[in-house]
C-alpha cells in the first residue's frame, strides 16, 4: 500500500477519533465531519485516478457536492442553535422540542 493511502486513512481515522472525543460542541463535531469528508474525497480521487476508471470520474465531484451541502446545513444549524440557546453544546439539545 503506497504511503499516501496510509496518510489519507490516518487523516480519516484521526477525524473519526476527534469526532468521538470532541462531541460535546457542535462546531468541533462539524469540523471533524469536514475532515472526514475531505479525506474521503482525496481517497476517492486517488483511487479513481490510479485505477483509470472512466465511469467513476464523477464520483469525487458528487462527493464534494454532498460535502458542501452538509457543511451548509451544519453551519445553518449551528447559527440557529447558537442564536436560540446562546451556546453550541450538543447535550443541551433535545430533538423532541423541535
From Swiss-Prot:
Q: Name one GO biological process term.
A: ATP synthesis coupled electron transport
Q: What is this protein called?
A: NADH-ubiquinone oxidoreductase chain 4L
Q: How does it assemble?
A: Core subunit of respiratory chain NADH dehydrogenase (Complex I) which is composed of 45 different subunits.
- Please give the organism: Aotus trivirgatus
Please write the reaction equations for the catalytic activity of this protein: a ubiquinone + NADH + 5 H(+)(in) = a ubiquinol + NAD(+) + 4 H(+)(out)
- Keyword Cell inner membrane listed? The answer is no
Membrane topology per the record? Answer: Multi-pass membrane protein
* GO MF annotation list: NADH dehydrogenase (ubiquinone) activity
Q: What is the lineage of its organism?
A: Eukaryota, Metazoa, Chordata, Craniata, Vertebrata
Amino acid at each position: 500500500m503506497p504511503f499516501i493511502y496510509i496518510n489519507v486513512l490516518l487523516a480519516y481515522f484521526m477525524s473519526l477519533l476527534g469526532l468521538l472525543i470532541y462531541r460535546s460542541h457542535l462546531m468541533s463535531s462539524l469540523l471533524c465531519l469536514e475532515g472526514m469528508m475531505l479525506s474521503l474525497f482525496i481517497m476517492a480521487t486517488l483511487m479513481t485516478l490510479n485505477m483509470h476508471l472512466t465511469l467513476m470520474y464523477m464520483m469525487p465531484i458528487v462527493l464534494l457536492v454532498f460535502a458542501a451541502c452538509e457543511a451548509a446545513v451544519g453551519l445553518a444549524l449551528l447559527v440557529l442553535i447558537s442564536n436560540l440557546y446562546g451556546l453550541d453544546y450538543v447535550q443541551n439539545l433535545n430533538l423532541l422540542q423541535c
